[in-house]
Every structure is written in C-alpha cells, then in structure tokens.
Amino acid sequence: EHPRLAGGHLGAAKIADLNDSRFDFERVIPESLAFLRSAGIEKEIPLIAAGGIRSHADIQRVQSLGAAGVQLGTPFAVTEEGDAHPEFKRVLAEARDEDMVEFTSVAGLPARAVATPWLKAYLKIEDRLQAVVHAKNRCTKAFDCLAQCGLRDGLAGWGQFCIDNQLAAALRGDLKKGLFFRGVGE
C-alpha cells in the first residue's frame, strides 16, 4: 500500500513519512520481489499493489514492475453494483484529491479521509482534546473494538474519537457525523 496515495489507515508510521520515496512502487515492488525470491517463496506469495490505483494504465504500471495484481478500494466502493449507502458512494465519488485530509487515528496510525463536517470539527478541537488525554477504566462506548485505542487508553498523540461510531455513520451515509476514508490519485 502506497501511503502517499491510499485511503484509510496508511502504510507508514508517521504522517511526516507519507511522501517518503522509500514507499514508491518503483522501489517497493522490485525490493519486495527480490526479498521473496531470496526466501524462495516468490511463487507462493503474490505481490499485490494498492493505493491510488484508478485506471488501466495504473494497473499496467504496477504489473510492469512485477506486481501480480492490484487492490482497488474507492473505485469499487462507489460502483452501481455495490451495496453501500448511496450517500456513502456520493461522498467518495464526488470528493477531489484536495478534499482529503491526513490525521492520526485512534489506532495511532496516519489516516486519510474526506474532510467532512465531522472531521473538520474534530481537527479544530484536536489540540484541546490532546491536552486533556487520560485513560478510562473502560471503553465509554462499550465497543472495545481495538486492542489499543487512543480514546479509551488515553494515548497522547493518537486520535481522540470513537472510530467505530464515525465509520458506522459513514456507512449509513451520514455526512455530518461520518468518517469517510478515501485515497488520492497521482
């Protein structure tokens, strides 16, 4: 997964690393194939590229580098055949690359999503939330969906919201409360 292009939780440890060239497909795919080859398992493990793949040309490019296939997220999520809520599809389909924002999620990972009303409001108060971070005795939402959660565990620097609530709102098509993960293109 290319962290500069993918949506959702990104394949880098810090937001500052999202544009690092060490993640470029032109480097990662050949290096990964070389590792698989050296381990003698290149035939057993297909290398699948993901992040920012939107066209036939994108697929051809990563396959020419040695990828066995690709993973498409947003392009399939918004198809007519998909069973997602129509508003969920509309938000993803109509969002432009400049509508995306990067932030640290409750899992402590860089993430990319559409700058919805909820996400904009959260980011405006994030510094205040970080200033009062503290561990809770239990999950206040009663989900305990993550092994480590910035909100429940009081982890400074990690997101301070219930990701389960926000993702569920997005799936219901609730633009005002939803967290809509989405990638960008090149």
What residues fall within each predicted segment?
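Conserved active-site-proximal phosphate/metal-binding subdomains
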Residues: 2-25, 29, 33-44, 54-186
